[in-house]
Structure formats: structure tokens, C-alpha cells
């Protein structure tokens, strides 16, 4: 099974997206080991916490419980620093990419344009149009 790091937009699509997005992601993810990080957890839960949406929070927690969680340790931050210096990625995006690389993920699923452009130099990138073509 291939290993995949899902960035925040993909996790939100999986949990709170429209029915088509959710089905498409679920169908493709069964073939993968899913990696995530506390950074993704922070980003995706923000609105649910702000709105006290307990149902969404429970769905997110079930998702993260099923993931391999990447420790954002000093080595990941060092790699993120180098990526940010070389590519001018935003700090969170540099951390997402560094986490995926550090964990030897084969794929990064994102729809962030700048992150996609940079990540293609390091691993396979899957975005919404790519997922849509896999139907």
C-alpha cells in the first residue's frame, strides 16, 4: 500500500466536503496508509471548535485516530526551514511538505497551488482534478 500525507484541504473535503468529494476520497484512500500531523489537526478543527460543532469534532477525531501521526520534531522543522528558504513556501506548507518527506510518504494530496508546485520535486502530488480523473 502506498503512503499518503493529506493536507488540510483534503481532510476537510473528506470530513465536511460534498457527497461527491467524500465518496471520491474514501474510494481512493482505501488503497493507502494515511499520514497526518498535529498541524493538520489544528488547521481542520479550527472552525468546528470556534462554532462548537461537536459532531464535526467527533468526525475529525475518528479520522485522526485512524491515521499514522507524524511527530513534528526538530528534524522536520529543520527540513521545513530549508524548504522555506529554497522555495519561499509559507511556513505551514513547508511543515506539511517536510512532514511528508521525513515520513517517507510516497504521495502528498493537496489542492494548494504553491505547495503542489514545490512538492512535485520531492514526491507524487495528487490534487482534486487528479482524483476526479480516477473515478
Which residues are covered by each model-predicted region?
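Amphipathic alpha-helical segments within well-ordered protein domains
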Residues: 45, 61-64, 81
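A generic structural signal for short hydrophobic patches within well-formed alpha-helices
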Residues: 11-12, 41, 77, 115-116, ...
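Structured helix-beta-strand junction loops
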Residues: 30-32, 63-67, 86
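Acidic, PIN/NYN-like endoribonuclease modules and their adjacent C-terminal/linker elements
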Residues: 1-3, 101-135
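Short, hinge-like loop/turn segments at secondary-structure boundaries
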Residues: 51-55, 87, 124-128
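Active-site neighborhoods of divalent-metal-dependent phosphate/nucleic-acid chemistry enzymes
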Residues: 68-117
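General small-molecule cofactor/ligand-binding pocket signal
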Residues: 35, 70, 126-129
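Short, well-structured N-terminal submotif of metal-dependent ribonuclease cores
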Residues: 1-36, 47-59, 131-135
